[in-house]
UniProtKB/Swiss-Prot annotation:
It comes from Kluyveromyces lactis (strain ATCC 8585 / CBS 2359 / DSM 70799 / NBRC 1267 / NRRL Y-1140 / WM37). GO terms for biological process: endoplasmic reticulum inheritance; mRNA transport. This is SWI5-dependent HO expression protein 3. Residues 316-325 have a biased composition (Low complexity). Belongs to the SHE3 family. Residues 273-345 are annotated as: Disordered. The keyword Endoplasmic reticulum applies. RNA-binding protein that binds specific mRNAs including the ASH1 mRNA, coding for a repressor of the HO endonuclease. Part of the mRNA localization machinery that restricts accumulation of certain proteins to the bud and in the daughter cell. Required for the delivery of cortical endoplasmic reticulum into the emerging bud. Residues 297-315, 335-345 have a biased composition (Polar residues). The lineage of its organism: Eukaryota, Fungi, Dikarya, Ascomycota, Saccharomycotina. It is a peripheral membrane protein. The gene is SHE3.
Length: 345
């Protein structure tokens, strides 16, 4: 069924959310609770109230409720209109906010660019200031230099006038000496040509001698380099042969076996009640590698051997036969303690 316009007007919740009436709904309920109703007045007694009064009171309450409903409905429409207008305002404000945000972002980007440009300009300004200060200092120095040069120029001008007078006197004397020196110059020119030819011949002969000496020196250096390489090779081969003759690996294995036998002998002696006093072991001497000479130490002379090497000798010192003991071991002296005489019986 379709509602009439009056019913739609009297219906406050038509097309409106119930949350919109929360503001005035509390006041309406409070007014209803404060009004007296027949149920609040206690049980009805025919002696106190009549039916007409009850009906009148009910009509009054209905009229009051109707007027209150009309007021609430009008307030509801007003609130709806205000809500719609506030929604439109909010949409406009949101659009304005978004537009202002985009403008703010653009302005921030522009501000960042301007800030960067300002920093660049400040740095360039500092550099230019330093450059200007340096230029000002140089300008002051140049001004002082100009002053000094102007003073020197004045002195030189005075000297030039004096020199001019002297020059005129010298020119006069030169004319008289010119003829004499012309003759002398011709004779000296002839002597110079002959001297030049003789010096050229001597220079050519000396150059040939120097080239021959240089060639001899180069040959000597090459022979010294080859002798140095052969000495290095011979020394390395001799060192390897000496290491092979020493047979360090077999000596180390023999040393380990001797140490094992010594430990076994000590354990047996301690089991028999014999104490052994050990002397400190001698350390095995380390093999020394031949010292390497740097290129700065291998200085050679034109007619001698390299200063960093000596002539190798083929003589080898044989190992001493008197020391038959292995290196690192010494005979430990044992002292017998008096044991039980009945033990060996």
């Amino acid at each position: 069924m379709k509602m009439t316009e009056a019913q739609e007007f009297l219906t406050p919740t038509k097309g409106v959310n119930s949350s919109k009436f929360n503001i005035n709904h509390g006041h309406f309920i409070t007014n209803l609770e404060n009004q007296e109703s027949p149920s609040k007045l206690g049980a009805y007694t025919p002696g106190k109230y009549s039916t007409s009064r009850v009906i009148e009171s009910l009509h009054k309450q209905i009229d009051e409720l109707t007027s209150t409903n009309l007021k609430m409905t009008s307030q509801c429409h007003q609130l709806v209109n205000e809500l719609e207008s506030s929604g439109k305002k909010q949409n406009k404000q949101l659009e304005t906010i978004s537009r202002l945000q985009t403008e703010n972002m653009n302005l921030n980007a522009i501000l960042d660019r301007k800030t960067n440009r300002m920093n660049e300009l400040e740095s360039s300004l500092k550099k230019q200031t330093v450059f200007n200060e340096d230029a000002a200092k140089k300008n002051l120095e140049l001004e002082e230099t100009v002053k000094k040069l102007s003073l020197e120029n004045e002195k030189l001008t005075e000297q030039s006038t004096l020199y001019k007078i002297q020059y005129e006197a010298i020119v006069d004397a030169h004319q008289s000496y010119k003829q004499f020196f012309t003759n002398e110059t011709s004779t000296l020119r002839n002597d110079l040509m002959s001297l030049k030819q003789s010096m050229t011949k001597q220079l050519e002969s000396k150059t040939k001698e120097v080239l021959a000496i240089d060639e001899k020196i180069q040959n000597k250096l090459e022979s010294l380099d080859s002798a140095q390489e052969s000495f290095k090779k011979h020394a390395s081969e001799q060192i390897e042969d000496n290491i092979k003759e020493l047979r360090l690996d077999s000596w180390q294995s023999s040393l380990r076996e001797a140490q094992a036998l010594l430990k076994e002998y000590k354990s047996q002696a301690q089991a028999e009640g014999i104490t052994i006093q050990e002397q400190p072991k001698a350390s095995i001497p380390q093999l020394r590698n031949p010292k390497r000479k740097t290129s700065g130490q291998k200085r050679t002379s034109f007619y001698g051997t390299p200063t960093g090497f000596s002539i190798p000798s083929n003589k080898q010192t044989p190992p001493s036969s008197s020391s038959t003991q292995l290196p690192g071991l010494k005979r430990a002296s044992s002292i017998r303690i008096s044991s039980d005489p009945n033990r060996n019986r």
